[in-house]
Amino acid sequence: LPIYFIQSLFEATNLEDEQKEEIRTLIANRNFFGVEEILDHYEIADQVKEAFHQLPELTGGPEILADAGRIAPGEAARLAVERLRQIYDLLKIYGVEDHVTFDLSMSGSYGYYTGIIFRAYTYGTGDAVVRGGRYDHLLEKFGKKTPSIGFAIILDELMSALDRQKIKVETGHRNLLVYTDAT
């Protein structure tokens, strides 16, 4: 998925983790010129450099998936693109395809995502109101080995978007008592 696509690009560079993290940060900040500068300092295959160079163009509707498939530097990246096509076909069944945009430069900022990463936006805000993704190893840190997918609703962004859209939310007050047996 998006993260598999970009991870395959990173793996193809054979760079150290420190350089990969620097590139990941530059991509997250949409500084693709900085990415090119770093890549130019290392011996990296032209196909991989070209794939990184094309990343800013790999944002949009389903038409970008064909481009991504053409520049994919390896089998893992091609499989990720094919899986995104399959997910898009499922979303079409639910009639939401007009609300889907792909961004193959997304890699997540927490480092635990292992599959698809997604964000949800609404009118009146440029920031995501929902962020989530798949993480196969996160729950191992809590004693349970199981793949998972989850999301967070960013309440500040959601409330800001509702306010900008002039949607009033009735609020009430409730008393809440939380008890835990600290044994």
Can you name each region flagged by the protein language model?
Residues 5, 9, 34-183:
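Positively charged, Gly/Ser-enriched RNA/tRNA-binding surfaces
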Residues 3-36:
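Short terminal or interdomain "cap/linker" segment that borders an active site or interface and mediates
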